[in-house]
């Protein structure tokens, strides 16, 4: 951190001093602000924040005496902090203390330091204050009283309290890097190496300009470009061959002499062909069907928006109807405002128009019996009534006869005698009597004159098989009849369902919308292709009209040279660019006022024309203001004598 002086003051570089800059933050926190008189106002560093008091110092109101007094107090505080933090327990503290005291005394008692020239910046003149926490704005040539050295003895309790925070303090050290950077900058500006670099840069720029001004000429077109390609040669040879074939064919046909009946047959064939063509044309004309035109609502591009709008209206109507229903349900007495609209809804009217052929009021009204019948009792009663009504067929009565075979005596066999003897000897219980056959019991009940009837098992099985076959056949017939009835009912139901669905469904089939959508997609593809071609043509036109790169470079260089010549002319005349610009604007304003005064009678006519043709008036208003570049070019063409006269 340095305190700058004016350039003309003697010893300006030597009189500057550094005030405790940190060692590690020399390069990063060296930002300085230069005022108009050469005063350097450094930024506040960590040491300044540590040493500065907790009050704002106003540079316009504080006097030099109060500043020096504050400096002495800060010096005393810094000494105490350094002594307490560094040398409270070190045996070599006496030597370090003496060295630090010498450095501080040499800094604060330096007689060669000049007075700091502090001037109020423009910001302070306007009423704004600036906080300054650095030490380089303080005067150093004011006589300072001799300070009393601090006493070396302190109570042990104070040493212990200080040692708790003294280890975390960073001790700053002075440095002279800012002076070194300023000296290096001055040496670099005045060194011959910089002049050599400038000379090389100017030489390189001249070579580039000469290279840009060089003229180019196109080389002649090579001879092989005009020679035909192999493909073109082959195409020409093929065309010559076909021409020769056609010519020879025509020659042969011209030499041929046809008979008279061949010409007659060809004429007949041609007449028949013409008749067929006329007949087919008439058939095509008669067979043309009257095609239905596509409605405009489908071809309209805003169909989707209309559908969305209709859906939104439908939702609003539903919400309003729900609110009306809620009010009608909540109020016990229906008022006149809550009565239903006598005019039916659109959906109801559409349903009545489409489904008017269906019967809604049927004459047959079935009665519902709430009592569940006793099906088992009813079935038994039905069985009894059926048994009574059944017709009984009288059985065939045979005349009774008596067979005498039972009275015959059979001779006993020896095996039968043995078995009977064993049965008598064995003490077994008497065997159970065998059941008598039905035929025998029937015969016993009959009289002696009746003939017994015997039904065999085969007859019984045959009857049961016939009965089961008849039952199966009846069941099959019933199932077939039920299927036919069910099929008819389902067909009728499906027809009614499809009719109702078509009447209630607002969407159209794919066949109706397919052609319109196909046409719309084709139109969109055609439109995109046209836009793409138009963009390509615009790109080609921009590329063709754009100047070459060397032309752009030459134009920019010429513009820079004109601007530089204009600035040099102003410097030679002793004028500034801002002054000339202000003068030019002032003269132009005067000229505009004069032209307005002259053209005032024509104002009404111009306003009428602008109202009639607003586009032309807009174009004229856009063309009137001149660009600043044109103004600069006009001023650059003026001579230096005119510029001097303006001054």
Swiss-Prot record:
It comes from Homo sapiens. This is Protein FAM161B. It holds the Pfam family FAM161A_B. Residues 91-105 have a biased composition (Acidic residues). GO terms for biological process: cilium organization. Belongs to the FAM161 family. One of its GO terms (cellular component) is cytoplasmic microtubule. Signal peptide: none annotated. InterPro entries: FAM161, FAM161A/B. Keywords: Coiled coil. Interacts with FAM161A. The keyword Transport does not apply. Ubiquitously expressed. Residues 590-602 have a biased composition (Basic and acidic residues). Residues 1-39, 89-110, 135-167, 332-352, 388-439, 583-647 are annotated as: Disordered. Residues 332-350, 637-647 have a biased composition (Polar residues). Residues 262-292, 510-546 form a coiled coil.
């Amino acid at each position: 951190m340095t305190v700058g002086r004016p350039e003309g003051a003697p010893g300006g570089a030597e009189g500057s001093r550094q005030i405790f800059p940190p060692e590690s933050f020399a390069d990063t926190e060296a930002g300085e602000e230069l005022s108009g008189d050469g005063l350097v106002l450094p930024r506040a560093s960590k040491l300044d924040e540590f040493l500065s008091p907790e009050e704002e110092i106003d540079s316009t109101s504080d006097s030099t005496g109060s500043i020096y007094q504050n400096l002495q107090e800060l010096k005393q505080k810094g000494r105490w902090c350094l002594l307490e933090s560094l040398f409270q327990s070190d045996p070599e503290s006496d030597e370090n203390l003496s060295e630090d005291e010498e450095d501080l005394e040499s800094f604060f008692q330096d007689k060669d330091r000049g007075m700091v020239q502090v001037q109020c910046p423009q910001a302070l003149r306007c009423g704004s204050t600036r906080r300054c926490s650095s030490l380089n704005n303080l005067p150093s040539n004011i006589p300072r009283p001799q300070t009393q050295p601090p006493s070396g003895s302190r109570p042990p309790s104070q040493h212990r309290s200080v040692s708790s925070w003294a280890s975390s303090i960073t001790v700053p050290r002075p440095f002279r890097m800012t002076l070194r950077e300023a000296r290096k900058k001055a040496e670099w500006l005045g060194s011959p190496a910089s002049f050599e670099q400038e000379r090389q840069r100017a030489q390189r720029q001249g070579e580039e300009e000469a290279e840009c001004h060089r003229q180019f000429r196109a080389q002649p077109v090579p001879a092989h470009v005009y020679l035909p390609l192999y493909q073109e040669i082959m195409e020409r040879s093929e065309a010559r061959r076909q021409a020769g074939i056609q010519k020879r064919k025509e020659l042969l046909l011209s030499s041929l002499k046809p008979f008279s009946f061949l010409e007659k047959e060809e004429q007949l064939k041609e007449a028949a062909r013409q008749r067929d063509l006329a007949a087919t044309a008439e058939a095509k004309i008669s067979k043309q069907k009257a095609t239905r035109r596509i409605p405009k609502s489908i071809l309209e591009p805003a169909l989707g928006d209309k559908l969305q709008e209709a859906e939104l209206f439908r939702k609003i109507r539903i919400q309003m109807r729900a609110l009306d229903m809620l009010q009608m349900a909540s109020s016990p007495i229906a008022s006149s405002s809550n009565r239903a609209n006598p005019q039916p809804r659109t959906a109801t009217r559409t349903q009545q128009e489409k489904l008017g052929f269906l019967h809604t009021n049927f004459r047959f009204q079935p009665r519902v019996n709430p009592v569940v019948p006793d099906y088992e009792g009813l079935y038994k009663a039905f069985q009894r009534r059926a048994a009574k009504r059944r017709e009984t067929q009288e059985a065939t009565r045979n005349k009774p006869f008596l067979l005498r075979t039972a009275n015959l005596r059979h001779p006993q066999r020896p095996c039968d005698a043995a078995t009977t003897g064993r049965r008598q000897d064995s003490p077994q219980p008497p065997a159970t009597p065998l059941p008598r056959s039905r035929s025998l019991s029937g015969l016993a009940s009959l009289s002696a004159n009746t003939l017994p009837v015997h039904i065999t098992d085969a007859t019984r099985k045959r009857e049961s098989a016939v009965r089961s076959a008849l039952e199966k056949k009846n069941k099959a017939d019933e199932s077939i009849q039920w299927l036919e009835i069910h099929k008819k009912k389902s067909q009728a139901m499906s027809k009614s369902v499809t009719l109702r669905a078509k009447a209630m469904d607002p969407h159209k089939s794919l066949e109706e919308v397919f052609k319109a959508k196909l046409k719309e997609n084709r139109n969109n593809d055609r439109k995109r292709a046209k836009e793409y071609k138009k963009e390509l043509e615009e790109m080609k036109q921009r590329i063709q009209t754009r100047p070459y790169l060397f032309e752009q470079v030459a134009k920019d260089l010429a513009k820079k040279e004109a601007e530089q010549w204009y600035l040099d002319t102003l410097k030679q005349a002793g004028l500034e660019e801002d002054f000339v610009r202000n003068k030019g604007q002032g003269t132009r304003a005067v000229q505009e006022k004069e032209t307005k005064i002259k053209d005032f009678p024509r104002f009404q006519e111009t306003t009428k024309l602008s109202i009639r043709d607003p586009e032309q008036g807009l174009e004229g208003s856009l063309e009137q203001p001149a660009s600043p570049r044109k103004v600069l070019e006009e001023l650059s063409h003026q001579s230096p004598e005119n510029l001097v006269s303006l001054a």
